[in-house]
Amino acid sequence: MADCSYAHNTIKKRDTTVISSVDLDPAAIAIEKANKTKIYSDTLLVNGNYPDQVTRSDKFYDTLSKSRSWVARMLASLLVASHKDMDDGQTSTSKLATSRHYFQDFSGCVITQIKVVQANVFARAPGVDPGWAGRFLDNVHMLTQERVLRRNLLFNVGDTINAYRMSINEQLLRSLPYLATAYIVVSRRPLYPKEVIVSIFARDSWTISAGGKWRGHYYGDVFDRNFLGTGDELCLRYYLPIGEQLNGFEGQYTFNNFFGTFTNVKVVAGVGGSNNTARMEASRPFILPSDHIWGFRAGYTQRNCDMDTKDTTINIKMAEYALWYGYAWNLDPRLGTVFYGMFSTAYQHYYNRPEVGPMLNPFYSTTFNVMASFGFSRQNYYQGNMIYGYGRTEDIPYGYKFELAGGYQWSETRGRRYYASLTALWGNALGRGYINLAGRIGSYWTREQSWEQGVLDVSARYFSPLFKLGHIYVRQFLTFGATWGFDRFMGEREQINFTSLRDVRGIGVPREAVGCNRATLNAETVFFTPIFLYHFRFAFYLWGDVGFLGYNHMIFDNPFSSVIGIGVRIKNERLIFNNIQIRFGVALCRPGPYDFNWFDISNESTLEVDSFRPSVARPIEYR
């Protein structure tokens, strides 16, 4: 039987503990769980993977910190951390582990106490100075309120341990945007083996940031994803008066997990010459096997939109209203298999738009939709690291989803028509890596039995186990995607291009060279390095992309593009910023009208594997 008494003894007697550099050693909690799960839990372990480089690096850093130059000393203090500071060391695991295995040893035990252990953004182990920058940021940062963490728990004192529910809850905590990491540790009471104490460890992220868009629509924004430690999100955006765009201001506030209901409520209000918005939406996702999903959206939007088929911008005005509800029935409490049903309705009315007709720009037609879906779903999680992150524990879903959907649409230009779709998803870890497969097909049809605006989309994603190459860890990634459009119309959203998810990186396709069918294959070999500069980690990668885009349904007979290159991604898991990506490429083959950009610096969101959870019933997107 599992015994977590060591972890229990290291936790202070009070229910809430805030870790500082002179307080509790948080590594004890992580080490204890690591020993039980065979997964090193990312953020609190000393880095033992690179002993030679750590020793050499420490000598260099010590020399730099003792330099006579005040500039060198300042840089060493601000930017460089030795392995002693690396309390979230990049500890690797070459295999995925099922997240619920750790909790199965405690199944049926009664929870007698729930403790919360919190760490500030840059808090270190005892005796380790985070440096003046870390101390300053921790002092400025407002720690997440304890009640915010507790209302994200799916269990209470007096409940019995359910391994599946606990693993779902741990993943839920780690997915919160204001936490750098979170995990759950269970310890038995010394004299009462059927009673346990549950300890929640959570380390905050630095959640204040800024961003913007400098192409097409120009704006800058500042946001806080943990406003005043409440877990809510605040975003303020200013639209710059450049070109045809006028001054504009927009504010967004999101109440996350509103009053502990796991419902997120978002309010958006904006005013300006070309951007006016008033919108409110609320949504509650599926979380547990037997659960509800519901939501609504209502609002008015006026915004400049770039047209895909013409070199012009049109000020779009629209009102939209949507409502959805669903329920899932648990068929297997141990594995989380569910049968679910879903209902949704949506109305969109356009006041200003491009020209529309029976076969032109159906995307901008006023429509009323009613849809229903049902299916089977199962989702569990593996835990690993150095996949899409840079050392923190990552939750990779595995399972399946099979869904049938259908409905009715009234369109001002097409009249009454019907819709049907089929979705099949599957993902799991095999002997030599993880594979995720997806297939979707859907189409409208009219009372005259004519099929229209059909789409078929298939995809496959693979990543290999983690290999060690000297002091570097290597993982191989492959992604394939193919999309066919059938009986499409003319105008906006009726053709497709390369996108951020289905891309040949660096290739630019002009408007006159898009198509209805597309296939892409992306390959990456990623090298996770031991380079560590004040929690910024570096991953270098070799990449190659091929793509086909055109109107031929024999998809590999369409115009062909091929690119190879190298790049580096830089990520600080403690900060809310996206990855910084620097990429170089060479085009091996591209059609004459295509553009190519051999160099790019960008912000890149961390990729995620498709979820198998039930979702809102809606037509399959053609994108």
Where are these predicted regions, by residue range?
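Transmembrane beta-barrel wall of Gram-negative outer-membrane proteins
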Residues: 255-362, 366
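Outer-membrane beta-barrel translocator domains and adjoining extracellular loop/strand segments
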Residues: 248-251, 277-283, 295-297, 306-312, ...
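C-terminal transmembrane beta-barrel domains of outer membrane proteins
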Residues: 6-8, 48-65, 402-408, 415-623
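Transmembrane beta-strand segments that form the barrel wall of outer-membrane beta-barrel proteins
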Residues: 153, 202-242, 249-255, 261-273, ...
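Sequence/structural signature of outer-membrane beta-barrel proteins
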Residues: 121-123, 207, 239-243, 256-258, ...
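Outer-envelope beta-barrel architecture signal
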Residues: 110, 194-196, 206-208, 230-234, ...
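Periplasmic polypeptide-binding modules associated with outer-membrane biogenesis and secretion
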Residues: 9-221, 237-239, 248-252, 273-279, ...
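Residues that define the transmembrane beta-barrel architecture of outer-membrane proteins
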Residues: 214-218, 245-249, 274-278, 315-323, ...
